[in-house]
Amino acid sequence: MQKEQFSIAYVHAICSVAGFSCAKPSVDDQSIDLDIKASNRPFSQIGVQIKSTANIEYVKSDHINFPLPIKNYNDLRGDDVAIPRYLICLVLPDDNPEQWINQTPEQLLMLKCAYWVSLRDCMETDNTANVTVKIPLGNTFTPEALKSLIHKRSI
């Protein structure tokens, strides 16, 4: 529960800096945790599934091997959706919530960072429990990256 709430707060912070709004859908039946919108551009919305991990064994030299539940995988893949969908994975320093932030009178740091990937072009699988998704470490989830994802949507 704490990882989920922290991950959602992280995405909210990125959205705020980027100038976008985000909201939890009233029903989560399609693996979308948050809808992110740009209020000043029509048709500029994406949906995101947010996961987190403190397991350093998932993190490789240039990517994260994240075991995504099969339902989430199937909901996020494919191009037959009106709103693009992305997986965001927040890497945490460890499982202890006290290690996730560093606060001083001058700053509040959320430690480590999140990465994004589109599963749009991923293939069907015979897996029944989960699918290991490769998330590039070059896809850092930043305000600039989010603006780019939203811009792609509104073209």
List PLM regions with ranges.
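Mixed-charge (Asp/Glu-Lys/Arg
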Residues: 1-30, 36-155
